[in-house]
Amino acid sequence: MVNMEASMFLTFAGLVLLFVVCYASESEEKEFPKEMLSSIFAVDNDFKQEERDCAGYMRECKEKLCCSGYVCSSRWKWCVLPAPWRR
């Protein structure tokens, strides 16, 4: 009888401890995604995309010419890498 009571008490104490640990880690995890997203999407003047006179890879080439190293696909009207079968 005593072993059963002790094992029930230890099981209950283990569940309470597990609940406390999970709650603490969850409250820390709630702040982590916010911090991560704010650092990823932070606006920095050095990394802003600047306007170019040419279109880059997989950009429309109807109005703009493709940048050097790319050709305008006659089928899709996108700037793509030149390949032997596209020349």
From Swiss-Prot:
GO molecular function, one term: ion channel inhibitor activity
InterPro entries: Huwentoxin-1 (IPR011696), Huwentoxin_CS1 (IPR013140)
Cellular component terms (Gene Ontology): extracellular region
Disulfide-bond pairs as recorded: 54-67, 61-72, 66-79
Subcellular localization: Secreted
Chief place where the protein resides: secreted
Keywords, in A-Z order: Disulfide bond, Ion channel impairing toxin, Knottin, Secreted, Signal, Toxin
Domain of life: Eukaryota
Organs and tissues of expression: Expressed by the venom gland.
Leader peptide range in chain numbering: 1-24
One Pfam match: Toxin_12
Family of this protein: Belongs to the neurotoxin 10 (Hwtx-1) family. 51 (Hntx-8) subfamily. Hntx-8 sub-subfamily.
Entry note about domains: The presence of a 'disulfide through disulfide knot' structurally defines this protein as a knottin.
Protein name (record): U3-theraphotoxin-Hhn1a 10
Species this protein is from: Cyriopagopus hainanus (Chinese bird spider)
